[in-house]
């Protein structure tokens, strides 16, 4: 059985926040932010727009694109670090709101790697034969856990959601290989500070880790699929920082024109980052049926995940 993406949807909030916004209260500038991160703007959810609201919008699109009814979804997995509540989960809230039956629903926490982890979990459940259509959502409202007094991180984060329906696809398409991993010794470099409930990041250490692991994981995933860099049509890295992304691309040996870049529009949206990029490339006609995609992310934990897939239902 070949398992992959049967339906896709993405959602970004309406509010656009440009770099100049930060100039009034931080020692920074539009030019500096653009040069150091590649970010020009990001989207922030409104105060009354919760993580589950964004997940709902993306999910509706994914279910419609899959050509199924919501009632045909038999499991929900939501990758997020910013649930509406500690519990119930976003998946529970989403299940009720979508009108789906009493199916298995769970949130998965792997920070910015969460979408990769959740996709692979869904793949295994479908291949077991017990499930047919699993809704996987990557969503985060990072604006609510951003420390706006910290110049190094305040400028980075945005909000958004992406959703896919994972199920059986045509022969030769779908998820070809994957690589998942974690290193708990690096947990101290990126975490939610319990004192203020905001993100803390040791940028220097995270940068060194990300540059190395994104390249390694991508190369390993491609090799596991018995492919080479020349076979890759689109490289979709976690949109954390353009310099990290470029380093990973170079290590994989992918030409610049084959890398998806949406960090300039959305900033770092954690678990939503990769699906938002996929959505952008679909809109631009840069992803077509039977294209080989490499998706790779890293995040707090420290965690990482890479997936090689052949696009198409």
Curated annotation (Swiss-Prot):
Enzyme type, top EC level: transferase
GO biological process: fatty acid biosynthetic process
SUPFAM superfamilies, per the entry: Thiolase-like
Active site: 112, 238, 268
Biological or metabolic pathway of the protein: Lipid metabolism; fatty acid biosynthesis
The keyword Acyltransferase belongs to this UniProt entry's keyword annotation: yes
EC number(s) stated in the UniProt entry for this protein: 2.3.1.180
Keyword line: Acyltransferase, Cytoplasm, Fatty acid biosynthesis, Fatty acid metabolism, Lipid biosynthesis, Lipid metabolism, Multifunctional enzyme, Transferase
Catalytic reaction annotation: malonyl-[ACP] + acetyl-CoA + H(+) = 3-oxobutanoyl-[ACP] + CO2 + CoA
Subcellular location: Cytoplasm
Gene Ontology molecular function: 3-oxoacyl-[acyl-carrier-protein] synthase activity; beta-ketoacyl-acyl-carrier-protein synthase III activity
A Pfam family assignment: ACP_syn_III
Region of interest (ACP-binding), ranges: 239-243
Cellular component GO terms held in the UniProt record: cytoplasm
Domain notes: The last Arg residue of the ACP-binding site is essential for the weak association between ACP/AcpP and FabH.
Quaternary assembly: Homodimer.
Sequence similarity: Belongs to the thiolase-like superfamily. FabH family.
Role: Catalyzes the condensation reaction of fatty acid synthesis by the addition to an acyl acceptor of two carbons from malonyl-ACP. Catalyzes the first condensation reaction which initiates fatty acid synthesis and may therefore play a role in governing the total rate of fatty acid production. Possesses both acetoacetyl-ACP synthase and acetyl transacylase activities. Its substrate specificity determines the biosynthesis of branched-chain and/or straight-chain of fatty acids.
Protein name per UniProt: Beta-ketoacyl-[acyl-carrier-protein] synthase III
Organism: Staphylococcus saprophyticus subsp. saprophyticus (strain ATCC 15305 / DSM 20229 / NCIMB 8711 / NCTC 7292 / S-41)
